[in-house]
């Protein structure tokens, strides 16, 4: 009798659980408590490390990575909160909004690193007319993506409140993520073009031939360094500077993992809010949480502040239409090094503000138009 009762209860448990979660914003899935608490701890540690690195290296653009850490912590707090109430809209929005936009800040920092690398290796390796153009173009693209996602989320929220279809809002939200993925795909092409130029093309130039052979690997970076920008040879050639030697590899790992994560998020929304991807947390764990963790840990170990000697070395981004190779060169490293920490920090701060000036003004104008649009529609209804 007891066995029969246990069997009956065992068969009913999945049905009871499904019924209890029928109002779940996660399509019936309950976020794993242990995993999400673990991620809060991990991101809390990474956030603390990046704050310390900012104070140690005074590399202004580290703030972008700190913003990512804060958003990831908040996002996983939202998922932990959702574990006890999967129908809580506040917890769900905290999770979705924070974890969705967090990679944008990491990519903003990465875009700026490519501009720095072009200054270190030479402008002739850049496909765009100015190193800062990479920051302008792709940060603007990310901001547009964020705005479109925000509009889509707003339309979904209004639809849920009014009890109408969320199809339009979903489509707008998907369009925002698609813009982000397309932007990253273009950046990846530019990034690999840059790597091809500094690792393959220079070796062809060095041997005055273009073989497609593994023999190119036998040519060391030291042998071809004369083909790079002379001014920063000390950054590239110092034997003990392993952080810089592997920095390009670290950047590649970070970009590819974040790109994988963004593709997953896009696929998740295309499948639907109650689709297979969003209702099976293992996909989120592997393709979102793990990818972002790998990217951030990589950028923590190979921090740009250490790679570029952020506390003592000035690498200003040259203005557009100015070729740094035509400027006076110096063999004296001391002319490049600046022992004034505050001065170097001010340089990084000015470059950060310059790179963000146009994107922020564009963002403000765009949001103003959106607000006016919703305001006019609200007045029309009244």
UniProtKB/Swiss-Prot annotation:
Residues 56-57, 112-135, 193-241, 303-382 are cytoplasmic. Residues 1-34, 79-90, 157-171, 263-281 are extracellular. Induction: In response to loss of mitochondrial DNA in a transcription factor PDR3-dependent manner. Induced in response to altered glycerophospholipid asymmetry of the plasma membrane in a transcription factor PDR1-dependent manner. One of its GO terms (biological process) is lipid transport. Keywords: Cell membrane, Glycoprotein, Lipid transport, Membrane, Transmembrane, Transmembrane helix, Transport. The chain crosses the membrane at residues 35-55, 58-78, 91-111, 136-156, 172-192, 242-262, 282-302. It is found in: Cell membrane. Its main location: membrane. It holds the Pfam family RTA1. The keyword Acetylation does not apply. Belongs to the lipid-translocating exporter (LTE) (TC 9.A.26.1) family. Catalyzes the ATP-dependent translocation of sphingoid long-chain bases (LCBs) from the cytoplasmic site toward the extracytoplasmic side of the membrane (flip-flop). Involved in the establishment of the functional lipid asymmetry of the plasma membrane. Regulates intracellular levels of LCBs, sphingolipid precursors that are growth inhibitory at increased levels. This is Sphingoid long-chain base transporter RSB1. It comes from Saccharomyces cerevisiae (strain YJM789). The lineage of its organism: Eukaryota, Fungi, Dikarya, Ascomycota, Saccharomycotina. The gene is RSB1.
């Amino acid at each position: 009798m007891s066995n029969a009762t246990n069997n009956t209860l065992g068969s009913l448990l999945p049905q009871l659980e499904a019924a209890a979660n029928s109002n779940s914003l996660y399509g019936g899935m309950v976020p794993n408590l242990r995993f999400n608490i673990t991620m809060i701890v991990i991101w809390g540690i990474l956030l603390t490390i990046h704050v310390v690195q900012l104070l140690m290296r005074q590399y202004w653009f580290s703030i972008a990575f700190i913003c990512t850490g804060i958003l990831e912590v908040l996002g996983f707090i939202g998922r932990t909160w959702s574990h006890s109430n999967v129908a809580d809209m506040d917890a769900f929005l905290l999770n979705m909004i924070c974890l969705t936009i967090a990679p944008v800040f990491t990519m903003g920092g990465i875009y700026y690193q490519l501009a720095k690398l072009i200054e270190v290796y030479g402008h002739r390796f850049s496909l765009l007319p100015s190193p800062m153009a990479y920051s302008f173009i792709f940060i603007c693209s990310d901001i547009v993506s964020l705005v479109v996602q925000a509009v889509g989320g707003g339309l979904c929220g209004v639809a849920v409140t009014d009890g109408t279809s969320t199809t339009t809002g979903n489509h707008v939200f998907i369009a925002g993520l698609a813009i982000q993925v397309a932007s990253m795909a273009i950046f990846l092409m530019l990034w690999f073009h840059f790597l091809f130029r500094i690792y393959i093309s220079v070796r062809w130039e060095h041997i005055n031939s273009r073989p497609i052979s593994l023999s190119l690997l036998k040519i060391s970076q030291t042998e071809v360094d004369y083909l790079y920008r002379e001014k920063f040879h000390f950054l590239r050639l110092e034997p003990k500077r392993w952080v810089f030697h592997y920095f390009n590899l670290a950047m590649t790992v970070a970009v590819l993992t974040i790109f994988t994560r963004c593709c997953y998020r896009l696929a998740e929304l295309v499948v639907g809010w109650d689709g297979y991807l969003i209702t099976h947390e293992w996909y989120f764990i592997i393709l979102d949480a793990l990818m972002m963790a790998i990217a951030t840990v990589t950028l923590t170990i190979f921090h740009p502040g250490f790679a570029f000697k952020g506390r003592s070395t000035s690498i200003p981004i040259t203005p557009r239409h100015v070729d740094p190779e035509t400027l006076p060169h110096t063999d004296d490293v001391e002319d490049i090094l600046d022992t004034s920490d505050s001065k170097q920090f001010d340089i990084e701060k000015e470059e950060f503000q310059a790179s963000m000036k146009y994107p922020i003004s564009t963002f403000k104008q765009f949001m103003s138009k959106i607000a006016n649009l919703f305001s006019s529609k609200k007045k029309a209804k009244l």
